[in-house]
Amino acid sequence: MRVKPQGLVVTSSAVCSSPDYLREPKYYPGGPPTPRPLLPTRPPASPPDKAFSTHAFSENPRPPPRRDPSTRRPPVLAKGDDPLPPRAARPVSQARCPTPVGDGSSSRRCWDNGRVNLRPVVQLIDIMKDLTRLSQDLQHSGVHLDCGGLRLSRPPAPPPGDLQYSFFSSPSLANSIRSPEERATPHAKSERPSHPLYEPEPEPRDSPQPGQGHSPGATAAATGLPPEPEPDSTDYSELADADILSELASLTCPEAQLLEAQALEPPSPEPEPQLLDPQPRFLDPQALEPLGEALELPPLQPLADPLGLPGLALQALDTLPDSLESQLLDPQALDPLPKLLDVPGRRLEPQQPLGHCPLAEPLRLDLCSPHGPPGPEGHPKYALRRTDRPKILCRRRKAGRGRKADAGPEGRLLPLPMPTGLVAALAEPPPPPPPPPPALPGPGPVSVPELKPESSQTPVVSTRKGKCRGVRRMVVKMAKIPVSLGRRNKTTYKVSSLSSSLSVEGKELGLRVSAEPTPLLKMKNNGRNVVVVFPPGEMPIILKRKRGRPPKNLLLGPGKPKEPAVVAAEAATVAAATMAMPEVKKRRRRKQKLASPQPSYAADANDSKAEYSDVLAKLAFLNRQSQCAGRCSPPRCWTPSEPESVHQAPDTQSISHFLHRVQGFRRRGGKAGGFGGRGGGHAAKSARCSFSDFFEGIGKKKKVVAVAAAGVGGPGLTELGHPRKRGRGEVDAVTGKPKRKRRSRKNGTLFPEQVPSGPGFGEAGAEWAGDKGGGWAPHHGHPGGQAGRNCGFQGTEARAFASTGLESGASGRGSYYSTGAPSGQTELSQERQNLFTGYFRSLLDSDDSSDLLDFALSASRPESRKASGTYAGPPTSALPAQRGLATFPSRGAKASPVAVGSSGAGADPSFQPVLSARQTFPPGRAASYGLTPAASDCRAAETFPKLVPPPSAMARSPTTHPPANTYLPQYGGYGAGQSVFAPTKPFTGQDCANSKDCSFAYGSGNSLPASPSSAHSAGYAPPPTGGPCLPPSKASFFSSSEGAPFSGSAPTPLRCDSRASTVSPGGYMVPKGTTASATSAASAASSSSSSFQPSPENCRQFAGASQWPFRQGYGGLDWASEAFSQLYNPSFDCHVSEPNVILDISNYTPQKVKQQTAVSETFSESSSDSTQFNQPVGGGGFRRANSEASSSEGQSSLSSLEKLMMDWNEASSAPGYNWNQSVLFQSSSKPGRGRRKKVDLFEASHLGFPTSASAAASGYPSKRSTGPRQPRGGRGGGACSAKKERGGAAAKAKFIPKPQPVNPLFQDSPDLGLDYYSGDSSMSPLPSQSRAFGVGERDPCDFIGPYSMNPSTPSDGTFGQGFHCDSPSLGAPELDGKHFPPLAHPPTVFDAGLQKAYSPTCSPTLGFKEELRPPPTKLAACEPLKHGLQGASLGHAAAAQAHLSCRDLPLGQPHYDSPSCKGTAYWYPPGSAARSPPYEGKVGTGLLADFLGRTEAACLSAPHLASPPATPKADKEPLEMARPPGPPRGPAAAAAGYGCPLLSDLTLSPVPRDSLLPLQDTAYRYPGFMPQAHPGLGGGPKSGFLGPMAEPHPEDTFTVTSL
């Protein structure tokens, strides 16, 4: 359509004849026809003469100035007609069309032109205004706008104006979007607009090839610039317009001429111009080209016609040499053009007689082919005009590049001889120089080159031509502006051009007519001389020169404008310059890439991919550093090196720069900082960044730091990171650490892009960067948050929590990090990343929260881990929860929630915002979208896709919801969906690439979903992205799923919220990304992590998706959690000594690379699951390797993912690859994967675990602790075993781990890991996501629950219910109210129902995670083991949650809500009580309480719920939970469901943490499934997001976690 409409537009514009217009109406029966018909009608109404008179006079009345100009034009035309029309125009006209007709056409054209000009006067302003409008339109529909804007706009506005703006918009847009092409396009566009402008004229102008009177006007009209210039100089400007038109024509024509000269066949030139025109016209020249031939050809003819053979032909002739040269320069364009020229030209030639007839012309319009032929001259003219043709676009760029060729022709136009010489020189291959003079006499049809040269000469001679020249000049300026200048400059340029033309028009008009304008023009073209002559217009050109063209232009400019003689030499120079210009153009193009981040995102993603090696190298470097620091003396090395890293981070952090590069870096950040191989380096870097950043609160560094720090540091960071490292943040957001590289890898472009996108876009990167660094924490606002960037996220969250007591004490933090366990999911990703990154991050985290780091890093490795882990966890959990919650609120509150979030943010600004976002989320399922991303990812993919798909897909773009931040929330939903993420992941896993791309592209980046998001991400992620658009969100969202949702969405809101959705979006994203990242957190985020991690990671990730790197690296809270998880796991898993971590780090690093891949996979998986489940499925061993690769590595990201998925499926067996199982397995396996990779490092597990944890952030940790850590085998076994065990033993372990073995194992982590895993697995079986969903997701669930739930109908209410406690806090009202009531009720239901649902649905939990889709089975299969026990309970919860998720989403969470509610309050509290007490009762509870108290509002619904109810409930739940992690799990399943079950499992010592984690995971994971679980989870996350909305959200998450 683009092509066609463009072609049509061009055609219509070009043809511009009544028939054409009529025809155009045919094509665009809408607006365009109206104006066109008017013009056409009028022109037809008036005889050609009358038309001429009318144009000159009748039309003049409309523009009195026009009359003058018209009069002048007629004189000019007369001149032109005498010299040019007689020679060229007439000959051409005659050759192609009867001269009489040509005359009539000219007259008519003039009349039309007058009309056009008339409109242009008004249009000028309109154009300027509309320019913006058009710009937007173009932006919205680059091509369509051309077509629609030109056509449609034209009808409303003078066609010229519309075209004009189409031109400007397009060029601007194009420039931004397609710099190189655009450069040509501007000319083309100018020309094209001319066509459209002329279109009205072409009617009459059809036959009047000469269109002498029309020549200037026609040229102006044809040029389309005239409308602008004309409007500008409409009054007296007829002449000026003519000049401008001439200029435009010159600009337009030069290439056309070049093309034609090269074509040397009139037909060829015509088609060539057509081609050129279409391309410029269509933003997508390539798409356009094919059509361009047919479409453009007709317009070409009309173009020639409107130009009035003389004007256009002359100009075209002038341009022809340039065009030829351009073609020579651009063989590609040349070749196609010649073909087009030959074929279309010939067609046109034969039809030219037809073209003569307006009707024929219209027909031609209809028939692209016939359209061209309508006027032999018209066609050539069009061709000239079309010179803009896409092909010429390049050419034009080249020729126009220096505008030397253009300048030559332009100048020549003024003093045509010079241009001719120049053109000749330029078109040396076809030697137009000689042809131009001969061509003048020569018939147009026979020898277009000759005719064109003739025309060129004629214009030189012709005063009228001079007018055209003025126009031409304008064109040059215009074209130049777009080409050289950015959109902004372009506008300025445009204005300048107009002003110049107007200002100089009086003087220069004469000069131009005289031919003196050439120097001016040349100056303008060259930029130098033009500057002298036209300071205004020139200035912009000069700017162009600045763009790198200056030297050449200057050289050309001075010589060329100075002497026609120089033209030859200059022509050579021009040719060289033109050729060089293309390079410059490329440069510009590059610039524009930078300039256009949005487009850049994809490019960046690609770039990232391309630079992956670079990134890897860098990462390797970083890894080495990280490894060294991490391995050697993480505390010592890291602390010292961290600052350097910070500095380095800034380098990297220049994510702006790096972003593109780092897409690898982003990825790397995600990976290095966030995850995997690079994770180490990046973690180091990220960590460093986050470390210093957090410390320094370097907002910018934060970007990188945000990537690393944010990943580690927290949502803010991550969010910051998001922007900072789009890829990185996004990756993290998506997958967390792998996200960056791995994800990018996995998702490949998507993730990186996504990541880039996410951070860049959603995070508002900068905003987040600042925010994250300082903003983030600031976002989080709590000083505490700021205190540790880690805290920033973590800090903010954790810090908020820390403030709460998390930070306050290691214990608190530990507990917090218990949440970290859930964070574990984040950890999954984060852990994976955190293996060392996390480890570093633990340092970092500690750094971030110096306290945390200190004890985390230094002293209490175990405690540190605990504290760290807890810290991370809570932040993660809380953050994630908050994130989800915050986002959720954001979603519902959207602005308000953000406000709420802000409010909450007050305490935990970020979190509150997150909460807001989260809470908001509930409001919109689309909010769910935010949630959905998580949910969608995991659950949404499954559930959301099913349920939320609408929101997911639709709100997917919740863009739909985006409006309300909704993406954020939506993403929150997705965040919740993060779980979905995981599930989606599976889809996405496969889809990953797609989705990643897609999703990512969406910025859903999410694509974390990318995997899940893919499905969703694609569906919802994009929306998230879109919503956030949220491209950032995309990135963030992608965070990726949520990140974006949060980030993008939330980022927007989130961003708004400091949690900026970092928490939510980022976090989620993180979960998503993080989860996706599989970066443990990513993975976790991805999976449940999608959910959970989404929560944690989400939170964190969202912290940034940017965070994910950090989060991953820094882990944000999540990451910290993850790191902590790792650390934390290690923390829990004391044996996960830092050394292990370090060791793991070494493993991790290389493996991290692999992990990266895995992480990518995880990214893919990130569905978290992908990796997570991959690993888990991988049977611990394979999975571990695979998963690890996947999770950690994201090795083949996709491949790995696939493999993992397959294996996972295999392992998953029933669940199949269901993410749930995957997560489940991932819990086992993934830990193995991440952890395994880290293999025995549980730290690895932790780190990886987070990766794993991602899968079972909570469970994972457990698993990781248990499995990998312990054995790595333990985890491996645990992972594998856990996987299986988890499958069976895990289920048992789940129960058993729930028993403390795992707990002991993980301490918390093991429990968490295993239990969590178990729980997670049960939930987590929601593959990593499940974990996220289940265990991991539990928080996500919880967290996400709010999201999911949030999104769900119950989302809000349910959400409230889920967060009933905190609900009140956050906005909890809904949540609270609903949830609360359900809460009470849910316990039973939750227990039974949820449990039940969970058991079967565990998958459901996962289901929405993705497992929900298949996972029920998966979960059932996988989870059943785990779920069997817990599965039943959890299963129920999961099922309920999942169902809720799935069904709840659709269902509206009522049911789920109940369970969730209960779960949340129920298990959540149990989590609090059981977990808190069991695990670090004090930490958990204390932390929780602290968290609670602190977050209390955060509510941590569960906390508050748990707090009062929590304790009781917690107690009860713990029992229940402990008793059957299943039931608790049921409760936890949703929120605590997983959390609870996990909690239950975790109820053991780690329960608090595990529970927390699981809960968090549940919240997180459940985010995916929490949508359903939301209520239950909602209790936690909801609570968090509800209560804390922002802070509570984080806290809530934490709370959920804690609880």
Swiss-Prot record:
<feature type="compositionally biased region" description="Low complexity">
    <location>
        <begin position="1187"/>
        <end position="1198"/>
    </location>
</feature>
<feature type="region of interest" description="Disordered">
    <location>
        <begin position="264"/>
        <end position="285"/>
    </location>
</feature>
<feature type="region of interest" description="Disordered">
    <location>
        <begin position="717"/>
        <end position="792"/>
    </location>
</feature>
<feature type="compositionally biased region" description="Basic and acidic residues">
    <location>
        <begin position="179"/>
        <end position="194"/>
    </location>
</feature>
<feature type="compositionally biased region" description="Low complexity">
    <location>
        <begin position="273"/>
        <end position="285"/>
    </location>
</feature>
<dbReference type="GO" id="GO:0001707">
    <property type="term" value="P:mesoderm formation"/>
</dbReference>
<feature type="modified residue" description="Phosphoserine">
    <location>
        <position position="1324"/>
    </location>
</feature>
<feature type="modified residue" description="Phosphoserine">
    <location>
        <position position="896"/>
    </location>
</feature>
<dbReference type="Pfam" id="PF15735">
    <property type="entry name" value="DUF4683"/>
</dbReference>
<feature type="modified residue" description="Phosphothreonine">
    <location>
        <position position="1401"/>
    </location>
</feature>
<feature type="region of interest" description="Disordered">
    <location>
        <begin position="1253"/>
        <end position="1286"/>
    </location>
</feature>
<feature type="modified residue" description="Phosphoserine">
    <location>
        <position position="829"/>
    </location>
</feature>
<keyword id="KW-0832">Ubl conjugation</keyword>
<feature type="region of interest" description="Disordered">
    <location>
        <begin position="19"/>
        <end position="108"/>
    </location>
</feature>
<feature type="region of interest" description="Disordered">
    <location>
        <begin position="150"/>
        <end position="236"/>
    </location>
</feature>
<keyword id="KW-0804">Transcription</keyword>
<feature type="modified residue" description="Phosphoserine">
    <location>
        <position position="1399"/>
    </location>
</feature>
<feature type="modified residue" description="N6-acetyllysine">
    <location>
        <position position="79"/>
    </location>
</feature>
<feature type="compositionally biased region" description="Low complexity">
    <location>
        <begin position="216"/>
        <end position="225"/>
    </location>
</feature>
<feature type="region of interest" description="Disordered">
    <location>
        <begin position="394"/>
        <end position="467"/>
    </location>
</feature>
<feature type="modified residue" description="Phosphoserine">
    <location>
        <position position="1064"/>
    </location>
</feature>
<keyword id="KW-0217">Developmental protein</keyword>
<feature type="DNA-binding region" description="A.T hook 2">
    <location>
        <begin position="544"/>
        <end position="556"/>
    </location>
</feature>
<keyword id="KW-1017">Isopeptide bond</keyword>
<keyword id="KW-0225">Disease variant</keyword>
<keyword id="KW-0991">Intellectual disability</keyword>
<keyword id="KW-0539">Nucleus</keyword>
<dbReference type="GO" id="GO:0030154">
    <property type="term" value="P:cell differentiation"/>
</dbReference>
<keyword id="KW-0007">Acetylation</keyword>
<feature type="modified residue" description="Phosphoserine">
    <location>
        <position position="268"/>
    </location>
</feature>
<feature type="modified residue" description="Phosphoserine">
    <location>
        <position position="1549"/>
    </location>
</feature>
<dbReference type="GO" id="GO:0140585">
    <property type="term" value="F:promoter-enhancer loop anchoring activity"/>
</dbReference>
<dbReference type="GO" id="GO:0005634">
    <property type="term" value="C:nucleus"/>
</dbReference>
<feature type="compositionally biased region" description="Polar residues">
    <location>
        <begin position="166"/>
        <end position="178"/>
    </location>
</feature>
<comment type="function">
    <text>Transcription factor required for the proper patterning of the epidermis, which plays a key role in early epithelial morphogenesis. Directly binds promoter and enhancer regions and acts by maintaining local enhancer-promoter chromatin architecture. Interacts with many sequence-specific zinc-finger transcription factors and methyl-CpG-binding proteins to regulate the expression of mesoderm genes that wire surface ectoderm stratification.</text>
</comment>
<dbReference type="GO" id="GO:0043589">
    <property type="term" value="P:skin morphogenesis"/>
</dbReference>
<dbReference type="InterPro" id="IPR039225">
    <property type="entry name" value="AHDC1"/>
</dbReference>
<feature type="modified residue" description="Phosphoserine">
    <location>
        <position position="846"/>
    </location>
</feature>
<dbReference type="GO" id="GO:0005694">
    <property type="term" value="C:chromosome"/>
</dbReference>
<feature type="modified residue" description="Omega-N-methylarginine">
    <location>
        <position position="891"/>
    </location>
</feature>
<feature type="modified residue" description="Phosphoserine">
    <location>
        <position position="1187"/>
    </location>
</feature>
<keyword id="KW-0677">Repeat</keyword>
